Amino acid sequence: MDLTTLLADPNARTILHERARALAGRDRSADVATGELTLRFTLGDEQYALPATAAREVLRFETVAPLPAVHPAILGLVNVRGRLLACLDLRPLLGLPATKPHPAMRLLIVSAAGIEAALLVEQVLSIQPEPITLHLTPAAVAGHSASWVRGVDDRLALHLDPEGLLCDPRLTATE
């Protein structure tokens, strides 16, 4: 069967369009070059990064006031100079094993989309000014956090979108 005959058949054309849409939605493997400053931090043995413009400050972890009936990623509230901020542990959202907070950890204060929060991290590594190339991750690799994972760089750091992260519906206290 030649292509003209195949495209003339409405059923075949529908199947081809459905397959093309499925393939287009599945592959996010293109590379994107970015020249923004990135802040690198660790969670466990893994490196992560986000745009440095979203970072406000880095503080020592002291205490957190737990909240009842919230997602495991919401540890509770921290007091930052009189402001109460949600303290978030990204491990449950990224499929990493839970870790009990300890004094050697840091709070990375981030702001995006009008929301400010404290991310619990092992350590802040650096702010890097050089251009990077992000390799977009397939949705299957990014898992359920795919909406706020921008890609992975050549050093295998997963780059996060702070706006998508802070607007994730799982991080909204509803009760």
Label for each model-derived stretch:
Residues 1-175:
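An acidic, low-aromatic, low-complexity terminal/linker signal
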